[in-house]
């Protein structure tokens, strides 16, 4: 019934909007847009004159594969990128790594507003399902990149711009379906420019999928609305967007034995009978979270050389994950953990219980950004500033227990609050030193104040009060021997604070990074190439240990010195009128230097070891055949080399190399009547049906009880299997 109502509403809206539209427009997915930049991102975006390594992804490129998978999966074929999916098929919880750096080190901004969670520093795209349908461009900067808003980039930064204003009215309906009972419905509309000054547009989306992993279902809803006023010198825009996700938990992974015999098995929600035998699974072992974003942007052209921008943001997030804790499976069942008093029943002391609990997050995030930009024929100057405040409440509630004594309903067994404030500003400039040489300088100061106070889920008291100030300078030169090519060199320093999990696990130090980039770009009519070398030197890097916490988040630790060296090549070559070839290569060496590890109770110097989750080879390729402007088909391939999930080079910690190919076909036509354009898209993922794992975890512990007086280090690993051959196909109607 829900789906039927959805279709009725969007069809009614589509015909109503079409009836009001009198202007004949070009029937393309990329409708005409105004030239005035809608959200001022000049200060944080890179251009061809910036000595930074970057790749731009357009709305048109995104739309070819946008059938319901998350943004990280849509960026999978970019240089040096590795993506992950807990549910195995790109819907639900997904992740991205760039140059071996995980998502907590990839700075993400939405219209210049930081999107990384202030405490965990992660990005959770599951909270914004189908956000790709509201994106006009994504810029991926590899390395430190330019100064940006939010925490410093330690591997990459991702600048996401939402949709431009449309000159003409339109509406569209898009439906896609595929393997694992995946179904996506999207309705979009725009009024176009009303009286040449006002515009209103929006999107509604639903995504449902059972996932590849058992019970790893996703039930996702999202919305995006924007209204704008613009004239020759002013653009004011207000945006409201957000999402609600309910996903059955699939972040536990499976061990090697289960992987070989039942790779889709999901241990989440296991329930056991009195004899210790598996009796079933808890049906509501879900993650349930809502995130709402409110943005206001004002961009003012002062004169032909100066412009000013102001951005305001409020984000509210609230939700929980619910779990059944079974005594037989070693769950969180003890009274000490649940903050309950033991009691006596007859002659038996009751001090543990099967239970159902919810662990909550309830947070508010306020941001203000300002920008002042000056541009002439020979120089540019950008000043940017940010102030943000985050308040996050963390608490756990007990919903049910078999033997909980006098505990009150929804008894809270932990409760704490994290508060993080940040103030930063940057000043950057480019100047044409000569006709062929452009200088670049970028200076940033960040101040961070982070506090945590209360009881965490150990239970134990956690008290953190940390104030940090960072100075991050950057500089470089671009040499342009001709109009179609450039050579650049840059140096960038980045420093940043630990995240919440780091503080919970000890007394972490801030990280420091010196990044050197040397690159060459050439852009001709039928060939574009970008090649670069990088040298990233870390001090006190918070490396992934390979272990994870109870919600699958990675655990990190400071190491002394570490290094990433690499070479990357990214090309687009028009082989013939109908053939386009887009290869990319990334070769790297990723090392801990002078690494120590305690094995069997003895501290050992392992010397140089591989950094966790850092493959030395990542290759991407796209070969596209377009016999006409209406049809194209392409094969996309990805090779990811062997990875270690820990930092001690243990063979038990490896993820095998894998080579995966997808087939993507798109057909468009214009009926030229009441439907302006129809677009059909299909993607067949993993066409060779490879069994592979793109993510996992590794842990060690010391066995001190099996042999008295002897310590034995035990290793363990878990894996996240990815789906074999599976497909998505969709139809989009533009009115």
Q: Where in this protein do the model-derived segments appear?
A:
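Gram-negative outer-membrane beta-barrel transporters
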Residues: 435, 535-537, 557-647
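Transmembrane beta-barrel wall of Gram-negative outer-membrane proteins
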Residues: 170, 177-208, 213-250, 296-304, ...
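A beta-strand signature from Gram-negative outer-membrane beta-barrel systems
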Residues: 129-172
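C-terminal beta-signal and adjacent terminal beta-strands/loops
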Residues: 581, 589-591, 642-644, 668-735
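Membrane-embedded beta-barrel scaffold of Gram-negative outer-membrane proteins
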Residues: 301, 307-313, 480, 486-492, ...
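Short, acidic, small-residue-rich periplasmic hinge/interaction motif at the N-terminus
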Residues: 21-64, 103, 528, 532
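Short acidic/polar hinge/loop motifs at secondary-structure boundaries
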Residues: 114-142, 161, 258, 267, ...
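Extracytoplasmic beta-strand/coil segments of soluble accessory domains associated
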Residues: 72-114, 136
